[in-house]
Every structure is written in C-alpha cells, then in structure tokens.
Amino acid sequence: EADRCNDVPEVFATMPTQIVEISHENGRRSVIRARMAVSARQRAAGFQHVCEAEIARFPLLFVFDRDVRNRFHMQNVQVPLNISFFSRSGRFISNQRMPRPLLGQPGKLYGIESSYRYALEFSSDELQQLLSRPGKIRIVLRR
C-alpha cells in the first residue's frame, strides 16, 4: 500500500486552502488556514484515504451553495474527527465527535437536525477547545 502521506488522493490535492477567522463574542479572534471542499466531488471525498499527518495539517471546511442537512460518515478516514456546523452567516450551531468505525461494522452517519451552510472537520484538540467555549462563535472566510 502506498504511503498516503506521499500520495494524497487526487481530489484532495485540488482543494484550495483559505484563511478562516474564528471570532468569539468576548472579542477574542483566532485565525486558521483550512482546506476548502467546495465542489460536490471534493465534498464527497472529504478526508477519505488521507493520512493522519495531512489531516492534522489543515482542518477541512465543507462549503455548500445552499443550506443543507447532509450527513457525514467516517468510512476510510484514518483518525477520529470533530465536526462543527455553521449557519449561512457563519454562526456556530453545534459540534460532534466522530470516532472511526470498528472494523467490519457499518459506519454511523453524523449530522444535525437543523440546516447549515458550512461544516468544519478537524482532528486538533486546540481547535476543539476553541469551538467548545461558552458564548457565541462565528466564522468568517477571508477572501
């Protein structure tokens, strides 16, 4: 099997990176660089078949062109992930932990009941702590 760190999937390599600002109602701001899954093909691929080191480098922001209620799975994903959902205006809605499925077990689907525009997948504990703070949180995509 190829070393996945040296051999990222072709569709993953097409995902651009962009600066995303995370602002908290207390005035605190953090800036991250995230990969952007904007096409249907990029969103379908996500972090599948991507090595742990590459997943740790950049969070992955799924950008939809309308509000959706899509579900996410963890098949072919190397590490457990967190996923945070955001509204069209960038307002934080909620987050979930997505463990890797047990070998031979059907994978679970993850999502939320309300619609959302953005979903951010990541493995970073620091980012999880940032998004778990009480109070209103918003993301802004820097163009």
Regions found by a protein language model. Give the residues of each.
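Compact, glycine-rich, soluble single-domain proteins
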Residues: 2-143
